């Protein structure tokens, strides 16, 4: 009887190991596919050489990307990190790119996307969402911003649109709880200076460390948001102000 029980347990354990191995393999295969897709998109994004334009203008060819998928509204880049991705927006379909890649195919990684409540041209605060993927992929890189030393070496965020290149400087990094915590995602526009200051003060209050940067009402913001796993429904948020 004991031998039978032992064999049953061994069969179950082997079965669990095989199933686990399959899912690990499947996950790694999916990661590799998505890495290849984004490497391909980066090649499309590389601007064609034009001697009449300066190097900064050549950095990202938004028109080429738009020709492939006209849902693109920008390109997000943080130097010396893995964050170098297109940013999509579908105002009529909420979270469309949550589980879709740049080519609108199913993807666990999804694609960074601009909140449907934002207007790429006029919003005071551009709120961009992205998945927290292991190995610092997608917005998983933001996890490093919990440490002040990392922030000091990666202060600036570049954001390209169809018409211009913008640069932002980080002013706060914090975590909160979705739905019951600080509702930062409701602030795509500010009705008045008091509302703006309330938002900024709350961001700084929650920030992992103090960043001594002046910011004035009317200055544009960008917000990067991803999941944060130290708490249920956690969110990790990076706020930056426009400097160029």
Model-found features: residue ranges?
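N-terminal Sec-pathway targeting helices
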Residues: 1-13
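Solvent-exposed, non-transmembrane regions of membrane-associated and secreted proteins
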Residues: 17-244
